Amino acid sequence: MAGPRRKSPGITPDILLRAYSIGLFPMAESADDPEIFWVEPELRGVLPLDNFHISKSLAKRVRRRPFEIRFDHDFEQVIAACAEETSGRPSTWINQTIRSLYATLFEIGHAHTVEAWDGDELVGGLYGVSLGSAFFGESMFSRRTDASKICLVHLVERLREKGFTLLDTQFTTEHLKTFGAIDVPKAEYALLLAVAMESPHLKF
């Protein structure tokens, strides 16, 4: 990963979108640190939309529709859940600066959620940023078995349907690799990003 570059809390939503367009994304050291820094990995996580695959057991569970899937229904609740410290995630990079910035992106149509609901309870979800024909996945959470996985399946279906060309996962994890995520060298990623940025901003 390239060295972090410190940025003041005075960052604006416009600057944030510009950063995405040139391959940068923000993180914070912790939820209590008001500053953010820019990250530009040497290897970028990408989930090819034409090579997305799921296990037979997950496909069967998706068909059973265990949750109601909603898009862009409750952004604040989703990002708050993603920022929660849990036993499996004792710290978070989502600070208040990031939460405020992405709430504004949501208001202007550049941040989106996929949400899994069980009745009136939010049990899983993810959020990310859309720009051109790219979707930049930011974070996800799950309070029920497979809830975030099912949200990811619906995200990919949505992106394919709308004509998106790039699903950026920032980094790869063993979990994401089971869906087909790959590490893409920075130079190759720049080419994929350039194509996506040449596209008009697609409606999510």
UniProtKB/Swiss-Prot annotation:
**What domain of life is recorded for the organism?**
Bacteria
Name the enzyme group at the top EC level.
Answer: transferase
Q: Name one GO cellular component term.
A: cytoplasm
Which residue ranges does UniProt annotate as crossing the membrane? none
Name the chemical reaction catalysed here.
N-terminal L-lysyl-[protein] + L-leucyl-tRNA(Leu) = N-terminal L-leucyl-L-lysyl-[protein] + tRNA(Leu) + H(+); N-terminal L-arginyl-[protein] + L-leucyl-tRNA(Leu) = N-terminal L-leucyl-L-arginyl-[protein] + tRNA(Leu) + H(+); L-phenylalanyl-tRNA(Phe) + an N-terminal L-alpha-aminoacyl-[protein] = an N-terminal L-phenylalanyl-L-alpha-aminoacyl-[protein] + tRNA(Phe)
Q: What is its main location?
A: cytoplasm
Name the Pfam families on file: Leu_Phe_trans
InterPro entries membership: Acyl_CoA_acyltransferase, Leu/Phe-tRNA_Trfase, Leu/Phe-tRNA_Trfase_C
Q: Does the keyword Protein biosynthesis apply?
A: no
Q: List where in the cell it is found.
A: Cytoplasm
What EC numbers are recorded for this enzyme? Answer: 2.3.2.6
GO terms of biological process kind: protein catabolic process
A molecular function (GO) held by this record is: leucyl-tRNA--protein transferase activity
Keywords tagged on the record: Acyltransferase, Cytoplasm, Transferase
Homology family: Belongs to the L/F-transferase family.
Q: What does this protein do?
A: Functions in the N-end rule pathway of protein degradation where it conjugates Leu, Phe and, less efficiently, Met from aminoacyl-tRNAs to the N-termini of proteins containing an N-terminal arginine or lysine.
Record's protein name: Leucyl/phenylalanyl-tRNA--protein transferase
Organism, scientific name: Rhizobium etli (strain ATCC 51251 / DSM 11541 / JCM 21823 / NBRC 15573 / CFN 42)
